[in-house]
């Protein structure tokens, strides 16, 4: 087959896909590509457009149901709008809830009054939202965020810590860099290593690299770490009395990937399957407390264009929704 014939076949394939697309969405497609800096090859354009249109229709129908009072949150065709579910799931990492958690220190709840609203951002404990990119490093961002909060409470200084340090250097503890990892093993590394560098001295690259940790540049240390028992009440107490807590959740669903704002509740979410690490930075409720619209405030690592400027309100008090309390851990400094 000659080059000219092959090119003609390729062009014909792209033309057929383009012709099947909805022309009324042309301007929205071009604007979306500009907004998220998307550039495709001639072969990719049609396939990505088809996926994007499917997601666009899903989002519009969901938001109609939100306007009708059938949903509690809205969705948006964000940077993941051209991804299939299979492609997005490759960005997640299966995180088995370890059997050894019973042998490790378990947070002992402190009795007493708990505030109805907590938001550690307002107390200066939380660094800006970051973007993990295509590296499966959510576990590193979650662990670093928990340490940042504790270091701030101890020193009064908020220092962004190096997630790349964790990606590159915690393999001996059992993490696998950009392939997969866990917050527990990340904290174990910092504890054994007796230090973690700052983002300023060990910046994030979003790819696997050789460990370049220098003890003299350490910006944080931890003395131990503890799990929170598998209970939303205990997690609530830990968030209120200790600070931002690292947790794992089930984030496999399109509704999570394309979340925009509101209190996220996904009936298909599992409380036993954990595949994404985030940081709980607070909790509260919308409307009247008696309305039952309670939420966890979580910080994600998909950039500020995802969700509520990088954050999500996830349903609280709904039977450990999405496993929010199944894998909660925090450091001591």
UniProtKB/Swiss-Prot annotation:
The keyword Transmembrane helix does not apply. InterPro entries: Papain-like_cys_pep_sf (IPR038765), Pept_his_AS (IPR025660), Peptidase_C1A (IPR013128), Peptidase_C1A_C (IPR000668), Peptidase_C1A_papain-like (IPR039417), Prot_inhib_I29 (IPR013201). It comes from the Eukaryota. Glycans are attached at residues 39, 72. Residues 1-20 form the signal peptide. Disulfide bonds join 135-178, 169-211, 269-322. Residues 21-113 form a propeptide. Expressed in placenta. Highly expressed in a subset of trophoblast giant cells in the parietal yolk sac and at the outside of the ectoplacental cone. Expressed at highest level in liver with lesser amounts in testis, kidney, heart, lung and brain. Not detected in spleen and skeletal muscle. Not detected in blood, heart, brain, testis, liver, lung, kidney, thymus or uterus. Its EC number is 3.4.22.-. SMART domains: Inhibitor_I29, Pept_C1. GO terms for molecular function: cysteine-type peptidase activity; peptidase activity. One of its GO terms (cellular component) is lysosome. It is an enzyme of class 3 (hydrolase). GO terms for biological process: blood vessel remodeling; protein catabolic process; proteolysis; trophoblast giant cell differentiation. The active site is at residues 138, 276, 300. Pfam families: Inhibitor_I29 (PF08246), Peptidase_C1 (PF00112). Belongs to the peptidase C1 family. Probable protease. In placenta, plays a role in promoting giant cell differentiation. Also plays a role in placental spiral artery remodeling by direct degradation of smooth muscle alpha-actin. This is Cathepsin 8. It comes from Mus musculus. The gene is Cts8.
């Amino acid at each position: 087959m000659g080059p000219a014939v092959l090119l003609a076949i390729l062009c014909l394939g792209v033309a057929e896909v383009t012709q099947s697309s909805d022309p009324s969405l042309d301007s929205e497609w071009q604007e979306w590509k500009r907004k998220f800096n998307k550039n495709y090859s001639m072969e990719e354009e049609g396939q990505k457009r088809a996926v994007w249109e499917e997601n666009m229709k899903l989002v519009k129908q969901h938001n109609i149901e939100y306007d009708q009072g059938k949903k509690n949150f809205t969705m948006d065709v964000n940077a993941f709008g051209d991804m299939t579910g299979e492609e997005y799931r490759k960005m997640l990492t299966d995180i088995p809830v370890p059997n050894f958690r019973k042998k490790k220190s378990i947070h002992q709840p402190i009795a007493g009054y708990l505030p109805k609203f907590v938001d550690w951002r307002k107390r200066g404990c939380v660094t800006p939202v970051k973007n993990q990119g295509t590296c499966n490093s959510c576990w590193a961002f979650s662990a670093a965020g928990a340490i940042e909060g504790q270091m701030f409470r101890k020193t009064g200084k908020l220092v962004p810590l190096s997630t790349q340090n964790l990606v590159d250097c915690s393999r001996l503890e059992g993490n696998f860099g950009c392939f997969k990892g866990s917050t527990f093993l990340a904290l174990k590394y910092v504890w054994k290593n007796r230090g973690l560098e700052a983002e300023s001295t060990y910046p994030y690259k979003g790819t696997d690299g050789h460990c370049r940790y220098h003890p003299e540049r350490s910006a944080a240390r931890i003395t131990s770490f503890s799990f929170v028992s598998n209970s939303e009440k205990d997690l609530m107490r830990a968030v209120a009395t200790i600070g931002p807590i690292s947790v794992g959740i089930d984030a496999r669903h399109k509704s999570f990937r394309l979340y925009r704002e509101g209190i996220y509740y996904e009936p298909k979410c599992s409380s036993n399957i954990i595949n994404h690490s985030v940081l709980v930075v607070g909790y509260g409720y919308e409307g009247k407390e008696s309305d039952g619209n309670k939420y966890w405030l979580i910080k994600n690592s998909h950039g500020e264009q995802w969700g509520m400027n990088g954050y999500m309100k996830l349903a609280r008090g709904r039977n450990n929704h999405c496993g929010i309390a199944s894998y909660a851990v925090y450091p001591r400094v």
